[in-house]
Amino acid sequence: MSLAELQAIAADWTPQLLAAAGYTLKMTAVAYIIGAVAGLLLALARLSQRRVISLPALVYIEFIRGTPTLTQLFLVYFSLALVGIVLPAFEAAVIALGLHYAAYMAETYRAGIEAIHRGQHEAAQAIGMTRAETMRYIILPQSLRVILPPMGNSAISLMKDTSVASLISAPELMLRAHDLTSEYYMPMQLYLIVGAMYLIMTYPLSMAVRHLERMAGKGRLSGRRR
């Protein structure tokens, strides 16, 4: 293959792969927001003393964690269509991925909340704060040190899991690579490039997570010294 042919291929691949990478990042961001908000609500429900609230949250979390992501994506995309709700691929993917990661984020939130000493709950109630005020002003701010590193890891995993959306024809990075492979018959080169693009997108998040873990470790160490 001549240099001119390689340049022509690169000129065709580059804009398509960059557009697909942008789509992947957008999908990741929207699904992450859905997961973070829904996960917090699930965690609060899971911690409720009322079983009518905590039990459905537990069942949902166990169902999501016990079934494949792809199954959940197909349930959202195809099952809703059976009742007349036809979602575009992007909306179906971000809803399915967001609700999937909500279950994992709920457990992250719960672990962070439960890491705060029970005495702080009791002290807040002693000065007249409601349960909601205690959670908002006392517990959640302190639990961030525990919550943020695994939440960052969830963002990395979510970005990689967007590849399943290619199976419902969402034009993300893996689908675009598959289409280009069918056109150019160069699978090894394309998938190596796509793998490198995923690494470039996730590496800054990995560095941020490591920094948060170091900060959390220093916080725990200074707390023990006191």
Q: Language-model segments: which ranges?
A:
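Transmembrane alpha-helices and adjacent helix-loop boundaries
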Residues: 1-226
